[in-house]
């Protein structure tokens, strides 16, 4: 990504985050969650990615992308939403979400805002599947 950006002069915006539990739960965090609270570890990982870069690349994300399950935000997913909201509050990184079939958008926004994320830095995605106009 860095090489392509440097060679082309294009500004490439990298995302960090996690997909919903049903398809995007990394085995490491699922196993760790079974052993105890992972909230601090997820927060520190997100914070480090934003301030120092992802892994050893030096590439910092310009946005977080998060997802929740259909009709619910699981406890596991909530850890990632809360960590991202906290890092966003501290560093200003925007958050884009993914909804399953247009469900949980308002709940995602409420959760992120309740954790201190700036509503002007949140975009709820994939709401086209929702028939609820309220």
Predicted regions and their residues:
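Short low-complexity, flexible loop/linker segments enriched in glycine and/or proline
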Residues: 3-5, 28-29, 109-114
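Detector for methionine-enriched segments
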Residues: 1, 45-48, 78, 104, ...
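Aromatic/hydrophobic pocket-lining residues that form π-stacking "cages" and hydrophobic walls in ligand
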Residues: 1, 84, 108
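Active-site gating/metal-coordination segments in enzymes
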Residues: 6-94
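Active-site core of metal-dependent hydrolases
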Residues: 90-134
């Amino acid at each position: 990504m860095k090489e392509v950006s440097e060679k082309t002069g294009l500004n490439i915006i990298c995302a960090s985050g996690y997909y919903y539990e049903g398809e995007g739960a990394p085995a490491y965090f699922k196993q760790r969650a079974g052993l105890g609270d992972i909230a601090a570890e997820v927060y520190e990982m997100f914070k480090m990615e934003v301030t120092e870069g992802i892994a050893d690349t030096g590439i910092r994300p310009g946005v977080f992308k998060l997802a929740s399950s259909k009709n619910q935000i699981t406890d596991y997913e909530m850890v990632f939403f809360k960590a991202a909201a906290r890092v966003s509050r501290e560093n200003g990184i925007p958050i884009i979400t993914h909804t399953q079939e247009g469900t949980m958008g308002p709940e995602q926004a409420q959760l992120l805002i309740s954790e201190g994320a700036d509503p002007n830095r949140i975009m709820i995605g994939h709401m086209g599947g929702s028939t609820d106009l309220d």
